[in-house]
């Protein structure tokens, strides 16, 4: 039996990957394709439902994304969100106009409870808006099923053809009824079943890797983080000793991390593991470099060079495994979304790379990666290890990277992580770390004046890394961390705590 497919058409909005995540949370498989995807290709995929995402354009713009009207003749339910809502209106003969009053952020909305999309949802509710244009007149066959004080058509429905549009963003957590809305759309309106899970994903991916690799050799870029670890074990399950894991110790790791990685994968998983000590090589390349994008590119390119050298020693190697996940791809920019910052797994790859890439986790969000890890029998402690970027401490030392600065941030980070664990908060906080922002400040220690480094602490709550909020760590924990770092880490006299959400900030400082 063919797998059910919800096709998410990407029009370039900032929350598009979240839509896919919300669908998958209901154990329904979905894929994201750009709006440039032809109607013939869409037909070939035989989707059970289609979702139009938001976007940054106006439907009346000359170069604005469009969609072939024939998509509405496929006979499958369609849900349009924000720009997608306006595009449905425009394409089917309704009217869209600019609004004198824009709606951004939390907004009160009134819904029509008779509409199946809003079944089981309170009529008077709140939602997350982010738009300038609005629907002024719905297309023929549609009726208004939601409004706000500013937006007279916050939602519309053609129940006969099962085409729906909402101006707000049900995919973000700030819309409290979003989960129920997606449930109603997927199960009540589309009649889909829960037939996709991380267990089925792992089984299918293992078979896929076997088919792709055959009897060829594979090299895995192992960092010891969650993503590369799950990718390595997944590939190892598929091809066993055909996989060689190369762990590049670039001198940018957290405290004791290199030894831990070697112990876990060599002894516990019986993998072919090569540990390469390349600290001097990486620090030499980074000398005098302060620009964060250049640092990322240098680290990414040097990683690949090391792998190529190791591959040459091993003989014929055909494939390289990377732990790339969905947010990596999104933050590197797609055809329809602006580049936020190049990701080390995507943007730093040299054009003359000698391997074919295997990225088994490319479609998954972080929580899904963890679930796959649990399915594969990876120890819980490793599966829930803190996210750590490929460039490592190289992007947690702002400005030029030196061994002295690395030692400062490494020790401060170890103290922070230790006290978070002591407080029982390690699985309650999505990510937490220390960084060195390259700021000196005056202080007083003993009877003397100091002029030392500042350490910034960053801790966020999230479920997918697409959006996050700063973690409300108890004051007594922050107090203990601050006192310990200042007293135990030489060269530091001030601690600051980052209280910025994402957006507007990213989780990492660089």
UniProtKB/Swiss-Prot annotation:
Keywords: ATP-binding, Glutamine amidotransferase, GMP biosynthesis, Ligase, Nucleotide-binding, Purine biosynthesis. One of its GO terms (cellular component) is cytosol. InterPro entries: Class_I_gatase-like, GATASE, GMP_synth_C, GMP_synth_GATase, GMP_synthase, GMPS_ATP_PPase_dom, NAD/GMP_synthase, Rossmann-like_a/b/a_fold. Residues 5-195 form the Glutamine amidotransferase type-1 domain. Gene3D superfamilies: 3.30.300.10, 3.40.50.880, HUPs (3.40.50.620). Pfam families: GATase (PF00117), GMP_synt_C (PF00958), NAD_synthase (PF02540). The active site is at residues 82, 169, 171. Pathway: Purine metabolism; GMP biosynthesis; GMP from XMP (L-Gln route): step 1/1. It catalyses: XMP + L-glutamine + ATP + H2O = GMP + L-glutamate + AMP + diphosphate + 2 H(+). PROSITE patterns: GATASE_TYPE_1, GMPS_ATP_PPASE. The keyword Nucleotide-binding applies. Residues 196-385 form the GMPS ATP-PPase domain. ATP binds at residues 223-229. GO terms for molecular function: ATP binding; GMP synthase activity. Its EC number is 6.3.5.2. Homodimer. HAMAP family: GMP_synthase. Catalyzes the synthesis of GMP from XMP. This is GMP synthase [glutamine-hydrolyzing]. It comes from Clostridium acetobutylicum (strain ATCC 824 / DSM 792 / JCM 1419 / IAM 19013 / LMG 5710 / NBRC 13948 / NRRL B-527 / VKM B-1787 / 2291 / W).
């Amino acid at each position: 039996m063919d797998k059910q497919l919800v096709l998410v058409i990407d029009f370039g909005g900032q929350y598009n990957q979240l839509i896919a995540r919300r669908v998958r949370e209901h154990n329904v498989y979905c894929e994201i394709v750009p709006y440039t995807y032809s109607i013939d290709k869409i037909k070939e995929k035989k989707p059970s439902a289609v979702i139009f995402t938001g976007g940054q354009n106006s439907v009346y713009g000359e170069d604005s994304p469009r969609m072939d009207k024939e998509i509405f003749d496929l006979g499958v339910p369609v849900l349009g969100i924000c720009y997608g809502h306006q595009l449905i209106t425009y394409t089917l003969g309704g009217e869209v106009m600019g609004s004198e009053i824009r709606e951004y952020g939390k907004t009160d909305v009134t819904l029509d409870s008779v509409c199946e999309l809003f079944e089981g949802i309170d009529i008077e509710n709140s939602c997350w808006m982010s738009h300038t244009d609005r629907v002024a007149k719905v297309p023929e066959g549609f009726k208004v099923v939601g409004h706000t004080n500013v937006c007279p058509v916050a939602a519309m429905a053609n129940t006969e053809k099962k085409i729906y549009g909402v101006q707000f963003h049900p995919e973000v957590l700030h819309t409290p009824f979003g989960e129920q809305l997606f449930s109603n759309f997927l199960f009540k309106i589309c009649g889909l079943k829960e037939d996709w899970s991380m267990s089925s994903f792992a089984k299918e991916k293992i078979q896929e890797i076997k088919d792709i690799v055959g009897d060829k050799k594979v090299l895995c870029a192992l960092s010891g983080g969650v993503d590369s670890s799950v990718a390595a074990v997944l590939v190892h399950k598929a091809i066993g000793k055909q996989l060689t894991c190369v762990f590049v110790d670039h001198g940018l790791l957290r405290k004791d991390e290199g030894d831990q990685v070697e112990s876990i994968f060599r002894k516990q998983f019986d993998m072919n593991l090569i540990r390469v000590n390349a600290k001097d090589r990486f620090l030499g390349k980074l000398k005098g470099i302060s620009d964060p994008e250049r640092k990322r590119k240098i680290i990414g390119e040097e990683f690949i060079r090391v792998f190529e050298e190791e591959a040459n020693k091993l003989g014929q190697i055909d494939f390289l495994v990377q732990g790339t996940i969905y947010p990596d791809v999104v933050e590197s920019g797609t055809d329809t979304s602006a580049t936020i910052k190049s990701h080390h797994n995507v943007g730093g790859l040299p054009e003359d790379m000698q391997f074919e890439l295997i990225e088994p986790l490319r479609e998954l969000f972080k929580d899904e990666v963890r679930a796959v890890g649990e399915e594969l029998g990876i120890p819980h402690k490793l599966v829930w290890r803190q996210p750590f970027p490929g460039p490592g401490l190289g992007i947690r030392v702002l400005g030029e990277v030196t061994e002295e600065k690395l030692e400062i941030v490494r020790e401060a980070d170890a103290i922070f992580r230790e006290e978070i664990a002591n407080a029982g908060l390690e699985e309650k906080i999505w990510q937490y770390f220390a960084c060195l922002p390259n700021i000196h400040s005056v202080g007083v220690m003993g009877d003397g004046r100091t002029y030392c480094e500042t350490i910034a602490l960053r801790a966020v709550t999230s479920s997918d890394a697409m959006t996050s909020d700063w973690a409300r760590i108890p004051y007594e924990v922050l107090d203990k961390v601050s006192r310990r770092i200042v007293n135990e880490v030489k060269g530091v006299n001030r601690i600051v705590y980052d209280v910025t959400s994402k957006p507007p900030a990213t989780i990492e400082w660089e």
